[in-house]
Amino acid sequence: MIPGQYQIQPGDIELNDGRRTLSLAVANSGDRPIQVGSHFHFFETNDALTFDRAASRGMRLNIPAGTAVRFEPGQSREVELVDLAGLRKVYGFAGRVMGDLD
């Protein structure tokens, strides 16, 4: 094996199978790029991102772990969100929840 080499089994890998998803239109109303990582609680993203924030509570981007989506100033795009799993408790980020989601 070469350092940093990926060894991936053939075929498709299903991500977040069976979890509720939601598509949202998101726009960057700010003057700087905003990048959101795969496991960031989308509800608590930068306030310059405009979208239906209430609908995104308890959700994250439905993208592979360790990746991110970048929103350039003035850019709008459709994103897919997926429910957070596990204990469904959120602490940190922007401090808007600090506890149970349900």
From Swiss-Prot:
Localization, UniProt: Cytoplasm
Record pathway: Nitrogen metabolism; urea degradation; CO(2) and NH(3) from urea (urease route): step 1/1
GO BP terms: urea catabolic process
Signal peptide coordinates: none
Gene Ontology molecular function: urease activity
InterPro entries (alphabetical): Urease_beta-like, Urease_betasu_sf, Urease_subunit
CDD domains assigned to the protein according to its UniProt record, in alphabetical order: Urease_beta
Coarse class of the protein's main subcellular location: cytoplasm
This enzyme's EC code(s): 3.5.1.5
Nuclease among keywords: no
Gene3D superfamilies from the UniProt entry: Urease, beta subunit (2.10.150.10)
Keywords from the named record: Cytoplasm, Hydrolase
A Pfam family assignment: Urease_beta
Catalytic activity: urea + 2 H2O + H(+) = hydrogencarbonate + 2 NH4(+)
A Gene Ontology cellular-component term: urease complex
Subunit structure: Heterotrimer of UreA (gamma), UreB (beta) and UreC (alpha) subunits. Three heterotrimers associate to form the active enzyme.
NCBIfam families assigned to the protein according to its UniProt record, in alphabetical order: PRK13203.1, urease_beta
PANTHER family: UREASE (PTHR33569:SF1)
Family recorded in the similarity comment: Belongs to the urease beta subunit family.
The name this protein goes by in its record: Urease subunit beta
UniProt source species: Pseudomonas savastanoi pv. phaseolicola (strain 1448A / Race 6) (Pseudomonas syringae pv. phaseolicola (strain 1448A / Race 6))
